[in-house]
Amino acid sequence: MSKVDYDSILKDFPFPPAVKEEIKAELEKHGLKKTEAKKVVEKCFQAYLANLMEPGEAAGIVAAQSIGEPGTQMTMRTFHYAGVAEINVTLGLPRLIEILDVRKNPSTPMMTIRLLPEYAKDREKAREVANRIEATYVKDVADIEVDIRRFTIIVKPDEKALERKGLTVEDLKSKIGKALKTEVEETEQGLAVQITEPSYKALMAAFDKLKDTVIMGLKEIKRVIIRKEEDEYVLYTEGSNLKKIMKVKGVDFTRTTTNNIYEIYEVLGIEAARNAIIREALDTLEEQGLEVDVRHIMLVADVMTADGELRQIGRHGVAGEKQSILARAAFEMTVNNLLDAAVRGEEDHLRGITENIIVGQPIKLGTGDVELVLKMGGKK
């Protein structure tokens, strides 16, 4: 049986190159005959034409409606587990608002950390990485007592807790000394810290500081959960610090991510932040059972990242930075915007949509995007 030349069939149809390659791959996969292949390509071309936008299409308005309408069906609940029973994250409408506002500090920062092959297959090795990441405080591995009479703090190490974390008494002693900038003595009761300033206030201040001293891990990572997914162990964290976690031994930073979009922007740049906005918004909508075409979200992400910096959708970002005075005033803070523009003597050239609707002029969208030219003279 002679091989069908699919290229000769496809060359008559003006598909984008990537679409042509995809169709060709599918035709080769199923080994269709020439007549069958032609019918399939014709069907694909009809679908392609049906999906093309009309000139002058209001892409922004359609995107706003397509995200906004499903948004009305989203729940207001803030906490729920995201596939991990022990970790709560913000979902639903509050999370979508967080994404579009590009909050620097999301209410429930969380990371998904994937490991290098030698650590991902073995639970004990995954636990080692988790210990290096999770914040371990002095109070987690020792009992802390205060001797008011002698102005001394006694730290009684818990041998089992230290062993679980892969620490020794020497490690604990060294960290306490660094934190309080003082000598630590080993006594029968435990590790003794003598307070230099003999006052109750100084003693209690040192006690509070010692309790919250991190002796291992990152202080931003409150908790780490290990889960087996398919054939590898994955770490989920409560808290986020992408920059430091990328340097932790055993972490596969090419597959590690956080739900803090601003942190992604600072560490990996604007293109990574754009992808994070798209992924997070899609995941939030899908978790609620809502289906939105990814291209609407891509348009929003493009607008938020177009200047090479993250801008929120709102009066402190995209909406507030419009050149038109009337467009800014129509969004929020009407009086303030009009007053400021009047004081500065600004002019509005009425180039956008909002301002033209306000003054009752045709807008540059759809049929209003073309200008008719009257041909004078000629045949009557």
From Swiss-Prot:
Catalysed reaction(s)?
Answer: RNA(n) + a ribonucleoside 5'-triphosphate = RNA(n+1) + diphosphate
Enzyme's top EC category: transferase
Q: What is the lineage of its organism?
A: Archaea, Methanobacteriati, Methanobacteriota, Archaeoglobi, Archaeoglobales
Q: Which domain of life is it from?
A: Archaea
| Database matches in Gene3D superfamilies | 1.10.150.390
Query: In UniProt terms, what function does this protein have?
Result: DNA-dependent RNA polymerase (RNAP) catalyzes the transcription of DNA into RNA using the four ribonucleoside triphosphates as substrates. Forms part of the jaw domain.
Question: CDD domains per the record?
Answer: RNAP_A
> What does the record note on quaternary structure?
Part of the RNA polymerase complex.
Gene Ontology biological process terms, A to Z: DNA-templated transcription
The gene name reads: rpo1C
The molecular function terms of the Gene Ontology recorded here are: DNA binding; DNA-directed RNA polymerase activity
Sequence similarity: Belongs to the RNA polymerase beta' chain family.
**Is Transcription given among the entry's keywords?**
yes
Cellular component terms per the entry's GO annotation: cytoplasm; DNA-directed RNA polymerase complex
How is this protein named in the record?
Answer: DNA-directed RNA polymerase subunit Rpo1C
Q: Any idea which UniProt keywords this protein has?
A: Cytoplasm, DNA-binding, DNA-directed RNA polymerase, Nucleotidyltransferase, Transcription, Transferase
Task: State its location(s).
Answer: Cytoplasm
Under Enzyme Commission nomenclature, its number is: 2.7.7.6
A matching Pfam family: RNA_pol_Rpb1_5
